[in-house]
A protein has these predicted regions:
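Mid-domain alpha/beta scaffold segments of enzyme catalytic cores
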Residues: 1-145
């Protein structure tokens, strides 16, 4: 998608899409999201470590996310959360990384974008115990109840 990004954005605009958010899922894609957002007026970015990538988060990832968040184009921390469906990272690490990123979002007064795949109880437990300003559920696999 990076190869024809201008065309994708042009088509989106021609279909009345006014703004687009490019989601970061690790440090590399978070940086790329910020770079893209800074190139296009109506594109914004999130920065974060996706649950799948939690086990590979470098020790300094919070500092790097905070630096990236200095861009005025960063509108949220995410995609963060817990994914019990694919289990690419151990659940305890996913939870730890989610909480750390929630703390960063709270400190920076940014909303969170969270990913919940077969993890309702775990996600709600974290959301109840840790403060956040606003949240967007990007992925969930349960019913509306």
């Amino acid at each position: 998608m990076y190869e024809n990004l201008s065309e994708v954005l042009r088509l989106a605009e021609s279909n009345h899409v006014k703004k687009t958010i490019c989601i970061g899922t690790d440090l590399e894609t978070s940086l790329k999201s910020v770079e893209i957002a800074e190139q296009y007026e109506n594109v914004f970015a999130t920065v974060g470590i996706h649950p799948h990538d939690s086990k590979d988060a470098p020790k300094n990832y919070l500092l790097e996310l905070e630096k990236l968040s200095e861009s005025k184009k960063v509108v949220a921390i995410g995609e963060i959360g817990i994914d019990n469906y694919r289990n690419h990272s151990p659940q305890d690490i996913q939870k730890k990384v989610m909480i750390e990123q929630m703390d960063l979002a709270y400190k920076l007064n940014l909303p969170i974008v969270f990913h919940n795949r077969d993890a309702d109880n775990e996600i709600f437990d974290v959301l109840k115990k840790h403060p956040f300003h606003k949240a967007l559920s990007h992925c969930f696999s349960s019913n509306l109840d």
